[in-house]
Swiss-Prot record:
Gene Ontology terms: biological process: pilus assembly
Organism in which the protein naturally occurs: Escherichia coli (strain K12)
The encoding gene: ybgQ
Protein name in UniProt: Uncharacterized outer membrane usher protein YbgQ
Superkingdom assignment: Bacteria
Family membership: Belongs to the fimbrial export usher family.
InterPro entries given in the database record: Fimb_usher, Fimbrial_membr_usher_CS, FimD_plug_dom, PapC-like_C, PapC-like_C_sf, PapC_N, PapC_N_sf
UniProt main location, coarse: membrane
Lineage, highest ranks first: Bacteria, Pseudomonadati, Pseudomonadota, Gammaproteobacteria, Enterobacterales
Length: 815
């Protein structure tokens, strides 16, 4: 009989999704049970008892708030939520729709807009709101209105990258190198204070060198109401029109990241070939902005921040000390603006040399603006003035040609006054084009052409001439191209990059790279990977440096891969066999052996590497032994530290000034957040890095890997944070024992079937009363109080001070 009664209750619960009210025939139950069952909450979909609840809120299936306190009030025969004005502002309504909703007794009156529907999902504790799409100011799942963005909490942070290496040649001096770089900062409200630092120490038998310090300090804050960002202090001049340089001053600029994805900027892709376990360092004006360890073979770096613009210096340092330097152009895509809108950049200050806090004795002012004149046409221009010695003006047009792609063309005029010469005036012409070819799925990421007169000087070039004339180069012509082409039937991907630069007073240079990779299946061998790459660098009046690379990789065993690769350059040929294996999602290792034609003993060498990813950071170690030549070992560690009033934690490294999310689980440790990469520490704190600014981000608790006896009431967080934010979210969590109880009141009666059991101090629901007072409580602690609620009645149960044998059923009086 009990089984049938439980089945009946299950059917009642399953009936909740019905759109209309349901009347239940209780005559099928025993007469003694009819008065002890509370099913009032099961009659209609979304019905909830009057009172205050902490719930999630979603608009058209997009979650806009977590842990929102809402009061449900009785109105006639219905229970409706009281929505305050601050929550309505997060809906993202158009201004005229928002203004049409009056406020009555601190609750917004929606009676004039009956098309807005409210439904409470009791199972997920979420208020679902349906709003006609035409009433919303936004339509994209990847973008939310500024009214929903969060600035985060106050705190301090430290992002760090640590590198150590030792090189011991067969003959000559051994050397040890230690270096570090990163960012330290403080958040207060929407303000962010940041200091970039880099340190380097090199020791050898005949040389000891130590350098570094704080490369720049600046203060910034996003201004969502203006769609812009204010920056004060030591920073870099970033422009879509003028060349970049370092300066100390102030800047106010529109931030593309506050726009939908299709209107955001472009970041360059950098590719090359490493001959050993090499370190790739990318810097701009002497400041390191990116550093990464790469294995032998072709590498692609495509995760640079899109705010990086101008010429980037790339240094590939091989583990045996050899260095390969080249440059890439990080030009912007066509400067397009939506119709009727204006984007702008204002900057003023004093220029400063690279890696210096001292400024030059001159002041500049710059402004640029882009206006969306028509739906697909933008006009843009700018001015840059420095005292009486330098003046520059630019004007251009950007055109979205739809299926033909997007292009821009601009002309820049500049007048430069040098102390020992007459004024020099000239023009510079620039053309940009980008296109996604849907028919062939080809991508022309950037095609750019620029030509400058002999007497044209950008402001950055003018400063070089004035303060460092011996090294100043006058640009004549630049051509850059980046193309991608997948060939789906062959599982083949082709990439090509080209940069050609000529100078009025220096040798021309050309750098080109072509990479092809595809996967094939041969018989029982699946997922065979084959890739080849050609890289060439040529400086006028110098020999061309060509590099060819071929790699074949086959799966072997459980997660392992065996490979062969060959590198041929103008000076040597390398053959290498390798084995790489992934132990689990946190650990991987590899080893290789090979020959190199231009080294002693034919360059016979063996290498090994190991990588470990933890919640606190990423560790990498590698080593090489080359017969009769050298031995080397290197190690790196990258991570971050974040502290707020709610706690502190070491965690995986955050990226530049992107937000990070601190999650608190009420002191419960080892709760997996965001897959299995981030776990709460001993104090119940975890920090999730790599959150995107101004983009709705979802972070979820892995409910399948919770520790025994742990319960998390809310397992999904979806919020949007502004740049540099330290987000914070507390997830109600319990760690304890699972207890089977029988609840009865002083008269021996049981609470009604379906009565809700809530934790007394937090109000979190921990269970529901079953037949004859039975209930299952999970993750509870000794001596805890719980409130049993049905309708407008309630009583309190108290767990014993000691729970020794949880296999036995406890009888708890409810007072």
């Amino acid at each position: 009989m009990n089984i049938y009664r439980l089945s009946f209750v299950s059917c009642l619960v399953m009936a909740m999704p019905c759109a209309m009210a349901v009347e239940f025939n209780l005559n099928v139950l025993d007469k003694s049970m009819r008065d002890r069952i509370d099913i009032s909450l099961l009659k209609e979909k979304g019905v909830i008892a009057p009172g205050e609840y902490f719930v999630s809120v979603a608009v058209n299936n997009n979650k806009i708030s977590n842990g929102q306190k809402i009061n449900w009030q009785k109105k006639g025969d219905k229970t409706i939520p009281c929505i305050n004005d601050s929550l309505v502002d997060k809906f993202g309504l158009k201004p005229d729709i928002r203004q049409s909703l009056p406020q009555i007794d601190r609750c917004i009156d929606f009676s004039s807009r009956p098309e807005m529907l409210f439904n409470f999902d009791q199972a997920n504790q979420q208020l679902n709101i349906s709003i006609p799409q035409a009433w919303l100011a936004w339509h994209s799942e990847n973008w939310a209105p500024p009214s929903t963005w969060k600035e985060g909490v106050a705190g301090v942070l430290m992002d760090y990258n640590l590198f150590a290496s030792s090189y011991r040649p067969q003959d000559g001096s051994s050397s040890t190198n230690l270096n570090a770089y990163g960012t330290a900062g403080i958040n207060a409200g929407a303000w962010r204070l940041r200091s970039d630092y880099q340190l380097n120490k090199t020791d050898s038998e005949d040389n000891h060198d130590q350098s570094g310090g704080i490369s720049r300090t600046y203060l910034f804050r996003p201004l969502p109401q203006l769609g812009s960002k204010l920056t004060l202090g030591e920073t870099d001049f970033s422009s879509n029109i003028f060349d970049g340089f370092s300066y100390t001053g102030a800047a106010l600029a529109s931030d593309d990241r506050m726009l939908p994805w299709e209107l955001r900027g472009y970041a360059p892709q950098i590719s090359g070939i490493a001959q050993t376990n090499a370190t790739v360092t990318i810097s701009q004006s002497g400041r390191v902005i990116y550093q990464k360890k790469v294995p032998p073979g072709p590498f692609i770096i495509d995760d640079l921040n899109q705010s990086v613009q101008g010429t980037l210096d790339v240094k590939v340092t091989e583990e045996d000390g050899r260095v390969n330097n080249f440059q890439v152009s990080a030009a912007s895509t066509p400067f397009l603006t939506r119709q009727g809108q204006v984007r702008y950049k204002l900057a003023a200050g004093q220029p400063r040399p690279s890696m210096s806090h001292q400024t030059e004795n001159e002041t500049f002012f710059s402004n640029e603006v882009s206006w969306g004149m028509l739906s697909n046409t933008s006009l843009y221009g700018g001015l840059l003035i420095s005292d009486d010695d330098y003046h520059s003006a630019a004007m251009g047009i950007g055109q979205n040609m739809l299926w033909l792609g997007a292009l821009s063309f601009d002309v820049t005029w500049a007048s430069s006054h040098f102390d020992t010469q007459q004024d020099e005036r000239g023009l510079s012409y620039r053309f940009n084009y980008s296109k996604q070819v849907d028919a062939t799925n080809s991508t022309i990421s950037l095609a750019a052409y620029r030509f400058s007169d002999r007497h044209f000087h950008s402001y950055a070039n003018y400063l070089d001439h004035k303060y460092n004339d011996s090294d100043a180069q006058d640009e004549k012509q630049t051509i850059s191209l980046s193309v991608g082409q997948p060939i789906t039937p062959l599982n083949l991907n082709l990439y090509a990059n080209l940069l050609h630069q000529t100078w009025w007073n220096a040798d021309a240079s050309t750098t080109a790279n072509i990479t092809a990779g595809f996967n094939v299946d041969i018989g029982d061998w699946r997922d065979i990977s084959i890739s080849t790459s050609f890289n060439t660098t040529h400086y006028e009046d110098k020999d061309r440096d060509n590099q060819i690379y071929l790699s074949i990789s086959l799966p072997f065993g459980n997660g392992g891969r065996v490979g062969y690769d060959m590198q041929n350059s103008s000076h040597s040929t390398i053959h290498r066999m390798s084995w790489n294996d992934t132990l689990d999602e946190r650990n991987s290792w590899g080893m290789s052996a090979g020959l190199q034609s231009d080294r002693p003993d034919n360059g016979a060498q063996v290498s090994g590497n190991y990588q470990h990813l933890s919640s606190a950071g990423e560790w990498d170690i590698s080593g090489t032994y080359a017969a009769s030549d050298y031995s080397s070992v290197s190690s790196s560690w990258s991570g971050s530290f974040t502290a707020t009033q709610y706690g502190a934690a070491f965690h995986r490294r955050s990226s530049t000034n992107e937000p990070r999310l601190m999650v608190s689980t009420d002191g419960v440790a080892d709760i997996p957040v965001q897959g299995n990469l981030d776990y709460t520490n001993h104090f119940g704190i975890a920090v999730v890095p790599l959150i995107s600014s101004y983009q709705p981000s979802t972070v979820a608790v892995n409910m399948n890997d919770l520790p025994d006896g742990v319960t998390v009431a809310e397992n999904v967080i979806k919020e949007t944070w502004i740049e540099g934010a330290i987000g914070y979210k507390s997830l109600a969590s319990r760690s304890g024992k699972d207890v089977n109880v029988i609840i009865r009141n002083a008269s021996g009666q049981f609470p009604p079937l379906g009565a809700d059991i809530r934790q007394d101090d937090s109000g979190i629901s921990v269970g529901m009363v079953g037949e004859e007072g039975h209930a299952w409580l999970s993750g509870v602690a000794e001596n805890q109080l719980f409130t049993v609620v049905w309708g407008e009645q309630s009583c309190i149960i108290h767990l014993p001070e000691r729970l020794e044998d949880t296999t036995k059923r406890l009888i708890l009086p409810c007072h």
